[in-house]
């Protein structure tokens, strides 16, 4: 491992240990972490995920059902993104000790696919149209008001590429449209020494996850991915919070796949010789070269968790930057305009509003296949956001700007999460 990366991770570990000792005896939960206030929301959805597009639809959420902590949520959206989802969350197998989550999603999306690396050309892209579905389940063992947790996670899914368009929106013929399926397992945990899991204002949180090796095809590599996420919360003024986030992801190849270009071309090529010699064939060969280069990199180094989208580097498309390693750090100031518990009960919603918030943020991220190259091409985002904190859910709207332009997004939960709907892990 590169000395600079080793030094960096050592400092993260030291900071985590110091945070644990410092906050464990000081930070008290400011409210019950197992919700009891029943709430429901029937709400229109007008969302946007950078690099995937916009969608509208309808969502339903029931929080703290039957006087307990369990939630149900469902959604239906259509537009650039076609998706349907259902989830049962925080079902207590053993009260306040063993918690079960399960969810199902199906989707059809037109993604934007770039070359790997921080310095990849933003104009050199292809647009795969992908459909699929997955069933996701998680068991969480929790202690001490959810301060200490371990989880096991399984995702059973399948997907296929329906078509691939070039940058001029011309479809390539001869694309493999067969279904791929598999089961993916993750193990992880968290140390949450904050005053509240949903809306923390002071303390620190450390999360880790390991996605276990899996491959769907004989020519693919097997590798596992370790993610580390450290977030600190410093109280400012009366209700405000200054938030710091540090994230590192590393893929470790355990069994290398095919790294011969000609062999991969036979399996994943775009059949460019069907086009007559000229611009169309040149465009096809260019797109094919990029596609195969990504396959080669993935087989040699694996793919760590990507940057870009709703969680990190918010001014870039979803999954914009990817490689064998990823490093991210950012800071966000959250102005809490109110600090209240205001009940509301209207025809389509009932619950408790606990805050309205403005935010300003700055982020920097980088990816590379080798540690020595990781700090070579950093990318930055900055912007502002608006949030509404309700009982059991946070709705946020962010505007972000970076080297490749601006993005807006309407999403749920705070940024810098380990998992999200657009990146379920």
Each language-model region and where it sits:
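Outer-membrane beta-barrel initiation region
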Residues: 24-103, 151, 175-201, 304-314, ...
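Transmembrane beta-barrel strands of outer-membrane/channel proteins
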Residues: 46-48, 58-60, 72-78, 100-110, ...
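Residue-level signature of outer-membrane beta-barrel architecture
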Residues: 48, 62-64, 90-92, 139-145, ...
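C-terminal outer-membrane beta-barrel translocator/porin domains of Gram-negative envelope proteins
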Residues: 198-351
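Sequence/structural signature of outer-membrane beta-barrel proteins
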Residues: 63-67, 77-83, 107-111, 157-161, ...
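Transmembrane beta-strand segments of outer-membrane beta-barrel domains in Gram-negative
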Residues: 28, 110-256, 272
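Outer-membrane beta-barrel "beta-signal"
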Residues: 187, 386-392, 406-425
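Membrane-embedded beta-strands of outer-membrane beta-barrel proteins
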Residues: 58-60, 74, 86-88, 137-139, ...
């Amino acid at each position: 491992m590169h000395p600079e990366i080793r030094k960096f991770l050592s400092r993260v570990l030291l900071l985590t240990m110091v945070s644990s000792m410092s906050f464990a005896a000081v930070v008290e939960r400011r409210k019950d972490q197992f919700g009891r206030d029943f709430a429901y929301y029937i709400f229109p959805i007008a969302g946007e995920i950078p690099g995937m597009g916009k969608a509208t639809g309808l969502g339903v959420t029931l929080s703290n059902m039957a006087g307990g902590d369990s939630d149900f949520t469902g959604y239906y959206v259509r537009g650039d993104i076609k998706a349907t989802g259902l989830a049962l969350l925080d079902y207590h197998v053993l009260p306040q000790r063993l918690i079960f989550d399960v969810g199902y999603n199906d989707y059809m999306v037109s993604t934007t696919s770039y070359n790997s690396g921080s310095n990849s050309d933003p104009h050199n892209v292809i647009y795969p149209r992908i459909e699929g579905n997955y069933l996701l389940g998680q068991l969480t063992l929790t202690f001490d008001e959810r301060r200490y947790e371990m989880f096991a996670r399984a995702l059973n899914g399948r997907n296929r590429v329906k078509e691939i368009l070039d940058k001029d929106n011309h479809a390539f013929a001869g694309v493999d449209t067969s279904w791929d399926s598999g089961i993916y397992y993750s193990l992880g945990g968290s140390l949450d020494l904050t005053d509240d899991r949903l809306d923390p204002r002071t303390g620190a949180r450390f999360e880790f996850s390991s996605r276990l090796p899996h491959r769907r095809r004989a020519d693919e590599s097997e590798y596992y991915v370790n993610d580390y996420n450290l977030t600190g919360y410093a109280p400012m003024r009366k209700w405000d919070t200054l938030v710091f986030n540090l994230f590192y992801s590393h893929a470790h190849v355990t069994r290398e796949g095919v790294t011969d270009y000609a062999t991969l071309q036979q399996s994943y090529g775009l059949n460019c010789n069907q086009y007559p010699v000229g611009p169309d064939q040149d465009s096809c060969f260019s797109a094919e070269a990029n596609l195969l280069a990504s396959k080669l990199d993935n087989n040699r180094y694996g793919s760590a968790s990507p940057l870009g989208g709703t969680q990190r580097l918010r001014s870039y498309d979803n999954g914009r930057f990817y490689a064998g390693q990823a490093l991210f750090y950012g800071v966000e100031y959250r102005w809490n305009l109110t600090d209240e518990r205001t009940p509301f009960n209207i025809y389509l919603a009932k619950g408790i509003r606990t805050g309205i918030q403005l935010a300003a943020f700055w982020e920097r991220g980088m990816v590379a296949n080798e540690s020595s190259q990781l700090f070579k091409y950093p990318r930055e985002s900055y912007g502002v956001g608006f949030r509404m904190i309700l009982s059991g859910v946070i709705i946020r709207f962010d505007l972000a700007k970076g080297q490749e332009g601006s993005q807006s997004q309407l999403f749920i939960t705070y940024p810098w999460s380990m998992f999200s709907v657009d990146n379920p892990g």
